């Protein structure tokens, strides 16, 4: 198989889909790997490392997309990449289709086999390719939030950890999943007072055990969320429904009651955000203010630490890349129910129910199309 690795073009996206180590393994297995020049440069993986591993360095994204049987990326294609789509192409990347109907339409129109990292499941039912970036984004969210709490950046001027004689800041984490637990770890490490809000009482019990009672846990309902965000200096949005648009847990009315200069970091923005006032932003223009509250809603937060993020991501994705290359997409999908869960588009048909529900489109199970 010919595997293509283009340079990411989303704003300040610095990660890369395959590392030199991955290239070496693919080439040794008899595959050909085309890497766009400078694709790994911002992840501290220069062209010469890819060449030494056996990759062919290609001068343009056009040729990578045109020649590859399977394109391996990090982020969902942006509009300027839609023209590269063609029938039968296998696209393996984060897709986050629910809030982007235009991308869904293009993938369907061109009959691309779109396999989304974020909806692949393992035998335990977890999301193994979403987990590493959720870990990174969860940890980063508190670092970023702490920075934006500084007065110079429009925040309240609060130090999350406090100092002797001055109480710490309050951090409210919406969602007790991978993002939430990692955000809580960092916030606690900084000395903040941390509250985690989740709908699942069993998950709240688990979190209480994990943190030995050192975090506050709240059952998610309108009353509790309103109170928690009103008291918070920093709110982290980390709600996930795999493949679907994130529910709006924090409403505009709740935001209007928050402290002036408080900060919201909505990590769920990839799936539309769980804060009603959230809208996607970029690393070039990351923050804005609504009702005196600073909002940071960058859709590719882990790109700010590309070396760590690329290694963490590809550790998880590469076994699937190798399986798809070895078996071909159809056979690999047929043999692995977890990989089937990752197929969002196939032969012009939408195959992910949460995306279909979010966009009001018809869908079919991919197993019925094979």
What is each of the regions a protein language model found here?
Residues 2, 8, 77-170, 298-300:
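Glycine/serine-rich phosphate-binding loop and adjoining beta1-alpha1 elements at the start
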Residues 2-106, 110:
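An N-terminal-biased, well-structured beta-alpha scaffold segment characteristic
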Residues 6-45, 152-240:
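Glycine-rich phosphate/diphosphate-binding loop of Rossmann-like nucleotide-binding domains
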Residues 23, 47, 104, 142, ...:
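Generic hydrophobic/aromatic pocket-lining and core-packing "Φ" positions
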Residues 69, 75-76, 95-96, 221, ...:
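Short glycine-/small-residue-rich Rossmann-like dinucleotide-binding loops
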Residues 118-159, 269, 274-370:
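Adenosine-phosphate binding glycine-rich loop
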Residues 209-291:
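Rossmann-like adenosine-cofactor binding region
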């Amino acid at each position: 198989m010919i595997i293509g690795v283009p340079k990411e073009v989303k704003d300040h996206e610095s990660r890369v889909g395959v590392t030199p180590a991955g290239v070496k393994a693919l080439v040794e297995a008899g595959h050909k790997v085309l890497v766009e020049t400078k694709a790994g440069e911002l992840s501290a993986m220069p062209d010469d490392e890819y060449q030494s591993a056996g990759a062919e360095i290609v001068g343009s994204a056009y040729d990578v997309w045109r020649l590859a049987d399977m394109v391996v990326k990090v982020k969902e294609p942006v509009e300027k990449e839609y023209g590269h789509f063609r029938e039968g192409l296998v696209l393996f990347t984060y897709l986050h289709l629910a809030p982007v109907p235009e991308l869904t339409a293009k993938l369907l129109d061109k009959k691309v086999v779109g396999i989304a990292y974020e909806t692949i499941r393992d035998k335990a039912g977890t999301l193994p390719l979403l987990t590493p970036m959720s870990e990174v984004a969860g940890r980063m969210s508190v670092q970023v939030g702490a920075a934006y709490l500084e007065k110079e950046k429009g925040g309240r001027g609060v130090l999350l950890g406090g100092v002797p004689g001055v109480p710490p800041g309050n951090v409210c984490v919406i969602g007790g999943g991978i993002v939430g637990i990692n955000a809580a770890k960092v916030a606690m490490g900084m000395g903040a007072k941390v509250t985690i809000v989740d709908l699942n009482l069993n998950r709240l019990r688990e979190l209480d055990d994990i943190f030995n009672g050192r975090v506050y846990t709240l059952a998610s309902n309108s009353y509790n969320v309103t109170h928690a965000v009103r008291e918070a200096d920093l709110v982290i949005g980390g709600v996930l429904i795999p493949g679907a648009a994130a529910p709006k847990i924090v409403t505009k009315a709740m935001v209007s009651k928050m402290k002036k200069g408080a900060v919201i970091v909505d990590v769920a923005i990839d799936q539309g955000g769980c804060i009603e006032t959230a809208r996607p932003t970029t690393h070039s223009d990351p923050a804005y203010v609504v009702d005196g509250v600073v909002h940071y809603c960058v859709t590719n937060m882990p790109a700010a630490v590309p070396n760590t993020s690329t290694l963490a991501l590809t550790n998880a994705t590469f076994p699937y890349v190798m399986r798809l290359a070895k078996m071909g997409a159809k056979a690999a999908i047929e043999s692995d129910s977890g990989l089937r869960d990752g197929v969002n588009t196939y032969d012009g048909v939408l195959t992910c129910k949460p995306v279909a529900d979010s966009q009001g489109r018809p869908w079919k199970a991919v197993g019925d199309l094979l």
